[in-house]
Amino acid sequence: MRILLRMKLHKLQKWENYLASVEKMDYKTFAPLEQGSDAELTETTAENLFVQISLYATLLEKYDLKKCAGDGTDFEKTVRIMQWLTDNTFYSGAAFKWNADNPLDILEYAYGQDFSHAICCRDKSVVFTDCLMALQIFAYPICLLSTNSGCHFVTHVYCRELQKWVLFDPSFNCWFTKDGKLLSVWELKTLYLNNDEPVLENYSFNHTDRCKEIYLAGFIKQNLTNLSTWHDNSMDRRGYKRNDWESKKEFKTKLPDFKMM
């Protein structure tokens, strides 16, 4: 079985094969969205989540992030950083390599490489979050989890000019609005629970507009049932021991709604 799985994953390292696999996803397998519960999750503080860790200085210098972000609002800078990440790395839900939760390691593997070095949604979210934090834009990664173990990672970003959290998906270079209003993950979930639909903004699946409906149903809507983040952005558990998922950072913490300055 393990050999067969590796053969399948190897086949999916080609973009056309991975794209075809996403296009063939069966809507019937998607779980219904539920209210979910965070009762078993721990809580955290702003002091835990938003530490200026030492590797941020390296990120800023090595990738010239201030130039990439440019001037403007937190939203404008966030969009530019997300576009930079999209332009320089590929996304794949069948990524062949598991990386440490360390943006320098992830970018060393994926930056400027072809699709065979694509990274998963967790890696995209971690890099995106840390790049924003290096620029002193408050952000944290979110694990979205359905009732049937479907999973996707996105990022919450605090836009100070709006005084609110806004949801971004760096794997698909997009965000969500309703009536022109930028949505948080909580607002997006409530919208779907009320049988309403968001507007998908700026969507890009590795520089194509393919699979939008599958993305909304299979990557986003079904996975909004359970929401969690990491307890802190410290260097603790940012290493990765081969074939040991437990060595990575845990996502067992409630999403905070801090008002940042």
Residue ranges and their predicted role:
Residues 1-23, 77:
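Membrane-proximal basic amphipathic "stem/tether" segments
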Residues 74-79, 87, 133-139, 161-165:
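Loop/turn elements at helix/coil->beta-strand transitions in domains of secreted/extracellular proteins
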Residues 23-116:
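Secondary-structure boundary elements
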Residues 88-91, 145-149, 172-176:
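Solvent-exposed loop/turn segments at secondary-structure junctions
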Residues 74, 117, 121, 209:
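Aromatic-acidic/polar surface patches that form glycan- and anion
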Residues 94-154:
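Active-site neighborhood of thiol-dependent amide/isopeptide-bond enzymes
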Residues 157-261:
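His-Asp-centered catalytic microenvironments across diverse enzyme cores
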